[in-house]
Amino acid sequence: MTLRPQLARYKDKTMTSVSFYEYSKLNAEEKAALLRRSETDISGFIEKVAPILEAVRTEGDKALARFGRELDKADVTEANLKVTAAEFDAAFKLVDASVLESVQFGIDNIRKFHEEQKPEAMWLKEIRPGAFAGDRFTPIQSVALYVPRGKGSFPSVTMMTSVPAVVAGVPNLAIVTPPAPDGSVDAATLVAARLAGVETVYKAGGAQAVAAVAYGTETVKPALKIVGPGSPWVVAAKRSLSGVIDTGLPAGPSEVMILADDTVHGGLAALDLLIEAEHGPDSSAYLVTHSGRVAEEALAALPEHWARMTEQRTAFSKTVLSGKTGGIVLTSSIEESYEFVNAYAPEHLELLSEQPFIHLGHITEASEILMGTHTPVSIANFSLGPNAVLPTSRWARTFGPLSVTDFVKRSSIGYVTAPAYPEFARHSHNLAIYEGFSSHALAVSPVRDAYLKKGA
C-alpha cells in the first residue's frame, strides 16, 4: 500500500519532496509498511540469477569473463580474472598519500578492535572433579570477501572484511569485486587489501562472483564461506547458494536511522541522515524525532546539504527520502521513538543527543549504535574500529556485526578421567535406557569396563 504523508505544510516550506509521517496517526498496516526495505521481496532476482549461477557452475572462467563483459561492461577475459602482483604494486602509485594514510589509520583501528574480539584458542573448565569441558576455536580454512562497486568504490569494505579475517587466522582469503570498464580493480581497494594482509583478488562481481567462489572455476578457488554486503543480485545469489556455501550474515542495501531528541539542531540530524541515503536509491534512511522543532529544522536544512553534494549522490538521497524507504518520522514522545526504532531494527543507528546514554538502555534492536553528536556513521564506516558490515532488513534482531567469530569455528572439547568416569557413566546409562538407546547404554555399562581392563 502507499503511505499517506502527514504534515504536508513542512514539505511546502522547503519545496522538497521528503516523505514525512506522524507515527501516532498511522494505523497498524501503515506502520508495518514503514518497516519494509527495498529488498524485502527478491523473488524476482532469485529467478534472474538462476541461469547465471548455472552458467558459472558448468562453464567456469568462460562464463565468469562473459558476464564481466555483458553485465559489468568491463574489459575482462579468462586470462585476466585474477589481479596480478604488478597490478597491486601499481595501485600504490595511483593512490594519493592522504588516502593511503587514512586507509592505514582505519586498518590500524579496525585491527585493534578485532584483536580484542579474538577468542582464546581453547578453554577448559573442570565441570566435576576429574571431568573437563570447554571450547576450541580454529579458523575457517577458506573465505571469500565480497567488495561491491556498483555505485562507487569501497576500500572501506575491503578493510572491514579483510582485517577480522586476517586476525582470525583464515589461511585462504580472496576478494571478489566488480572490475571497472577498463578491466582494472579500484586502486584504493587493492591498497587496502594488501595493507590488511590479503593478496588474492578476483575481478568478478554480482551473482556470478558468488557462484564462482561457491563452485570454483579454473581460476577462482572455491571457498567455504562468503561475507560482505551487496546488491539484490548478490543477496539473491547468496540465498540460492546457501546450501553450497556459508553465506554469512545478511548484508543488503544500506540503512540508517537517526534518533534525535530535542537537545540537538535538526540541521545536524539532516546532515547525518544523508550519510547512508547517498549510497543508492535502494537505501533506507529515517530521521525519527519527537521534536517538531528538530523535524522542521531538518527539512529546512536538507536543500542546503544537497547543494553541497555531488549530483549523483544528491539524486540517490532524494530518491530515498522522497520514497517508501526513507523520510522523517515525527513521534508523539521519546518512548514512541524507541518503539519505532526497535520495530525497525536498523543497520546503523545514531543516538543524536547531548545525553545519548539516557537513551541507550531503551534500544534493544540495532546492529550498530553510535552515541552522541561527534560519532556520525562516517567515522564508524571508515575508521573507528567496530565493523561496518552489518545485518540489514531487520536481521539485527538475531545477527550482530561482522566479527572475528564469523571467521572461526567452535569445537566443544570434553575429557573425562578414570576417577570421574563412574559417576558420569551411571547417569548417562540411566538416561540412555529411558530414551531407548541400547548402544548408548552399552557404551557406559560393564561391557566398557571389561575392555578397559584388557587394555591394548
Curated annotation (Swiss-Prot):
PROSITE patterns assigned to the protein according to its UniProt record, in alphabetical order: HISOL_DEHYDROGENASE
Highest taxon listed in the record's lineage: Bacteria
Keywords per UniProt: Metal-binding, Oxidoreductase, Plasmid, Zinc
Cofactor note: Binds 1 zinc ion per subunit.
Active site location: 347-348
This enzyme's EC code(s): 1.1.-.-
Binding of Zn(2+), residues: 279, 440
Disulfide bonds: none
Cellular component aspect of the GO annotation: cytosol
Biological process according to GO: L-histidine biosynthetic process
Family annotation (Gene3D superfamilies): Nitrogenase molybdenum iron protein domain
GO molecular function, one term: metal ion binding
Cofactor(s) this protein requires: Zn(2+)
Family label: Belongs to the histidinol dehydrogenase family.
Protein name: Histidinol dehydrogenase homolog
Lineage of the species this protein comes from: Bacteria, Pseudomonadati, Pseudomonadota, Alphaproteobacteria, Hyphomicrobiales
